[in-house]
Amino acid sequence: MSEILEDAIKSKAWPFEEAKKILDSLNGKTPEKGYVLFETGYGPSGLPHIGTFGENARMVMVQKAFEQLSNIKTKLICFSDDMDGLRKVPSNIPNPEMVAGYMDMPLTSIPDPFGECESYGHYMNAKLRSFLDKFGFEYEFYSSTEMYKAGMFDEMLIRVLEKYDEIMELMLPTFREERKATYSPFMPICPKTGKVLQVPIHKWDAKLGTITYKDENGETIEVPVTKGHCKLQWKPDFGMRWAALKVDYEMYGKDHLANGRLYSEICRILGEKPPVQLCYELFLDENGEKISKSKGNSISVDDWLKYAPVESMALFMYQNPTRAKRLFFDVIPKNVDEYITFNQKYHLEEDRTKRFANPVYHIHHGNVPKIETFGITYSLLLNLTSVCNPSDKSVLWGFISRYEPKAMPNNSPYLDHLAEFAIRYYNDFVKAHKSYLAPSEKHKAILQDILDMLKGLPEQIEAESIQKGIYDIGMKAGYENLRDYFKDLYQILLGQSDGPRLGTFIKLYGISETMKLIEEKL
């Protein structure tokens, strides 16, 4: 065993932990199909949101960790449940009245309200695929509609008929009495209306491969369960899909947690081994509510990328997948700065075990680019933007180049992008919410002391020396908690309750410019 493999096996990073579970489930052997299958799922009822991206990003992290631990081939599929019947019209789509006329129809049988694709389902699938492609995910796309109609599930659907009683025995205890009377794992597609029907099944025949039900007019209808004439209810569908495709690893959100046992048991009833599973926590919006594709109450991938690099979004996905996290625009600056810190630590670290534990290793699948920001963070750029209100990033570069003469847009592309992002973020989220504190007489005395301290400093002084001078003034200012001292300074000078290390900010903004800013407040 190589030292690299030993270090990977010892790693406690969650993608490696998941990869080890998969390898253990296979007893270290290649499956009969010749590869390990990773599956992600997508419900195309609404526009893809950042959680959809997150599931795929996390899945690839585990896939790449598994490839590090073994020589077994892998494959990632993205499965779209586009044959589901429409149950609710999303609030964030055009032509909702038109779509409302197709309730209970498969998503791929509803006209595209955006007027671009063959159907509503095809449009949503295209949106998903476009951003998965944009970020370089290597995957195969599976459509539920195509799989059912092409007969790819036929063998398992016949097996569901053969195991009908056993599956019903598993499912019925999970329902209320009124639902028990009407439930069947099969949902026929009505030959007349094309709707996905949830109706009682009066007869089933495994040899003929058919089910019999009564339609809304009371007419007895017999249909085959194969070739797309029926689909399964979502819980049996999950387990059937695992069995048919021989899935080895699946992730799902906490809303599936209670049903994970059912999916697994159905897979076993159908004669296959269920996959290793990871249940991740759901993202919450600014009000602490679950984000939803149909509500559109979250950040889209495009939203995030308007204000920050993709690596920061991937870091947000990496961190604590089993813990609920609030996902709104105010998490962006923190994740950008944390990414910068992790990137710098990775390239300074010689211990491979610690490198394997660093999030950037998994974000970049072991090929981590080295970025240079010369100690300038996203938060610092936001504060600089706050005081100089630039029309474009060239204004910020005037300050940056004076702070660090080696830094230029052409040799610091990452920092150049951050400057552009910071201006956008400030204009859209910070500017309108700034609230300045009018300085009291006590505050004015403190500001005068800081001004006097700055007057005697050369422009070449280190940021740490400036920070110490401000700290010393605070120690003499009579505050019980120095945090309140700095909070007051931030509110007076920057119009916000928190901010950067003032020594670094003053060094970047300039001593003479800071003196003018203080004089304005006096």
Swiss-Prot record:
Group of enzyme by EC: ligase
EC number: 6.1.1.6
Binding site for ATP: 293
Localization: Cytoplasm
Domain of life, source organism: Bacteria
Catalytic activity: tRNA(Lys) + L-lysine + ATP = L-lysyl-tRNA(Lys) + AMP + diphosphate
Similarity-based family: Belongs to the class-I aminoacyl-tRNA synthetase family.
Sequence motif 'HIGH' region, location on chain: 44-52
SUPFAM superfamilies associated with the record: An anticodon-binding domain of class I aminoacyl-tRNA synthetases (SSF48163), Nucleotidylyl transferase (SSF52374)
Motif stretch ('KMSKS' region): 290-294
Gene for this chain: lysS
Protein name, entry field: Lysine--tRNA ligase
Alphabetical list of Pfam families matching this protein: tRNA-synt_1f (PF01921)
Origin species: Rickettsia bellii (strain RML369-C)
GO molecular function: ATP binding; lysine-tRNA ligase activity; tRNA binding
Gene Ontology, cellular component aspect: cytoplasm
Alphabetic keyword roster: Aminoacyl-tRNA synthetase, ATP-binding, Cytoplasm, Ligase, Nucleotide-binding, Protein biosynthesis
A Gene Ontology biological process term: lysyl-tRNA aminoacylation
